[in-house]
């Protein structure tokens, strides 16, 4: 088990500022629409130990096509509100010798191997306290670059805590690093990353979680479609980073499902709930 430092907001800010510096270094262009749906700017005192938005907590549901999606969502919220989001992260990441201490110091919520009930309860409590919990509801990278089936945890947490779900669709960050395509400085140089923030989704405690989750999936995919429509980079024929249905080289949905099933439940995103 790696060293587990105490939660430290200064460490979180160092991580975010490092990310901002890397964006400036590579001159990455982040293009955002729907910012009016984000929480209002932070109104706490600048030296307050708690960085929370002024309107209460929310679940931030993020699409997952590449390994840097979480980072761009984090930078988006930080730039707009100075909110420090807490992510649900796997036990594997928490146990990693390098990532583990960072997960602990940043105050993220760890989902254990056997059961996620403790993490779920901890996340709901943080939401009630005004924190922003970020979730990748697809529970794994979608190699078809279409939003795949989502777990119900995001909407269930939001309903139990009485907070909205904010859908965040990210397109283009998968070009920088994703499955079978490692980081390339050449691709990152002046790369565009497109983000669309959907309207907050309010889920009542009596609503069907599966139906609400499927609606959330549709909202996230609509955001992706909007991002693709005005993405400032023309893909070549059969570009690997484009969906098959748009002439790209990514696997079709059927091929993606077969590949996920072949890898087993853990690599494919685990047991659906």
List PLM regions with ranges.
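Catalytic-site beta-strand/loop segments enriched in glycine and acidic/polar residues
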Residues: 126-155
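A cross-family acyltransferase "interaction/gating" segment
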Residues: 145-210, 237-244
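Catalytic core of membrane glycerolipid acyltransferases/transacylases, capturing the structured
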Residues: 44-115
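A transmembrane-helix-recognition feature enriched in membrane-embedded lipid enzymes
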Residues: 1-36, 96-106
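Helix-to-loop junction immediately C-terminal to a conserved catalytic motif
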Residues: 12, 19-64
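A charged, well-structured terminal subsegment
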Residues: 121-129, 191-221, 225
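Hydrophobic/aromatic ligand-binding patch that stacks against planar heteroaromatic rings
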Residues: 102, 125, 156-160
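Acidic, Ser/Thr-rich low-complexity intrinsically disordered segments
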Residues: 239-273
């Amino acid at each position: 088990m790696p060293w587990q430092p105490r939660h430290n907001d200064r460490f979180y800010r160092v991580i975010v500022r490092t990310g901002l510096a890397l964006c400036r270094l590579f001159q990455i262009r982040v293009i955002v629409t729907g910012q009016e749906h984000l929480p209002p700017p932070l109104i706490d005192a600048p030296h307050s130990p708690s960085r929370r938005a002024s309107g209460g907590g929310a679940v931030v549901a993020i699409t997952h096509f590449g390994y840097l999606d979480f980072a761009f969502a984090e930078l988006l919220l930080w730039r707009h509100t100075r909110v420090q989001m807490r992510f649900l992260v796997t036990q594997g990441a928490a146990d990693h010798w390098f990532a583990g201490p960072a997960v602990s110091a940043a105050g993220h919520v760890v989902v254990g191997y056997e059961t996620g009930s403790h993490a779920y309860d901890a996340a709901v409590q943080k939401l009630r306290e005004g924190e922003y919990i970020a979730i990748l509801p697809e529970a794994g990278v979608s190699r078809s670059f279409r939003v795949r089936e989502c777990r119900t945890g995001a909407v269930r947490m939001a309903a139990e805590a009485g907070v909205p779900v904010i859908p965040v669709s990210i397109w283009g960050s998968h070009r920088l690093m994703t499955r079978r395509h490692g980081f390339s400085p050449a691709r990152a140089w002046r790369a565009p990353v497109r983000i669309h923030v959907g309207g907050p989704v309010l889920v009542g405690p009596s609503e069907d979680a599966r139906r609400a989750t499927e609606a959330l999936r549709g909202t996230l995919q609509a955001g992706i479609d909007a991002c693709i429509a005005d993405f400032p980079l023309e893909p070549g024929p059969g570009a690997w980073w484009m969906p098959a249905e748009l002439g790209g080289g990514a696997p079709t949905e059927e091929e993606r499902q077969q590949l996920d099933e072949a890898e087993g439940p853990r690599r494919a995103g685990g047991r659906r709930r």
